[in-house]
Amino acid sequence: LNKPIYIIFCFIGLIFWSCEEEQNRDCAGVIGGNAIEDNCGTCDADITNDCIQDCAGIWGGENICGCTDSTASNYDSNATFDDGSCDTTNIIITFSKNVSPENDCGYDIDIKQTNDGGYIIAGCNDGYAWLMKSDMYGDKEWEKMYELGDYWGNRTVIETSDGGYLFAGWQGALKTDQNGNEQWIQKGVQSNNNQYPYYEDVIEHSNGFFYLIGGPVTPRGATGQGGQAILVKINQAGTVKKTKFYGGNCEDDLFRAIIESNDGKLLMVGEKGHGNQSYPCSFNFRFYKDIYVVKTGLNGAIIWQNTYGGNYLEKGMDVVTTNDGGYMVLGQQCIHNYDIYSCGPKTKVLALKIDEEGNNLEETLLSGLYFFEAGTPMALSNTNQGGFVFSTVPKNGGSVWLYRWGGTVQTIDKKISPGGLGGESIEQTNDHGFILSTTGNTIIKTDSQLSY
């Protein structure tokens, strides 16, 4: 072969071989390799870790998508990029109002949101049970009094499945229609003459019955027992179907909150007395108690009952379900070391998480709770983002203490002075704000960030 022609052929072959080699190299320079460079500049053969676009369209970004408009009903305080989902069709309403009736006789009121977006308020007027219906702005639509004594103790109210209302207080319970017209009144404790139930809370169960709890009440014929916690089952017509008592032999056992359990039973929270050192029961019984939680069947048969606490003072005040199938109990604690006059600076908020069997999973303590011997008012609610919020009375810094924690939201710790002492009730409203009532007849409607 002619030498010049041979050289040309060799040159062409070298070019062809070099190009083929270049085409078969991957991003890592490996001939025949399968590494690929992703949109973030990372070169490897693992396609499972390729970067992706976040909601802001940034490759490898870490933006949290959601509504960043604090005036929207679905505002997300954790969102870093507004994804256009903000719902501003519902106007966020906030207010603080005193709703004292003309002849107010009891400064503790309860409030619940109603299906029409307004509120139902329970209180005391001239010594008797009193209901007030308001619109969404807290302005009165109607108010009525009933022949049920209510000048002492706490009271509670719920909207019932038929659109009416059920009021419960220290003397008994009453049911009304949607306009507040009385349908029935149930006074006293069945088979216990001259005793009242001192109701603290009520629910309408999914089975259609009302369950009311309170105390302390001494069961008929139980002269060796102190006042016990009480559970009463009432049907829609106002007939008492079951009355049950719970607790020990010491004074002042009572329930303060009841909910339908995760499995459709009943869960009740309150306080149970215990001894003082060598004494089986204490003369200063309000200072020697445990948190008392009882789970029962639908006729009150005990499934389990537990106490939580030590040698001194713990009280259970409210309870809600948790997203993982357990319960969050709100209470208070004073480790007074047998000096009952030292609780002023020592009393703390106690948040107790338990499972369906009552096992103690976690305890959280917060300092700064004001101390009342009969129990500092406290109320607890779930939030729509999986967390919790409580209202109570702070030792200083204001008259209402609002605290939100858990779930996917940032913790809020806020003290305010709206004109009442906080802690009677709190619940989330349909615009993701909160409605709460206080001692002093002040109601407060906040936004989702607890501002008003």
Model-derived features: positions:
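A sequence-level/structural motif corresponding to short, flexible coil/turn segments enriched
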Residues: 90-452
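Primarily marks secretory-pathway-exposed extracellular/lumenal segments that are disulfide-
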Residues: 1-105, 447-452
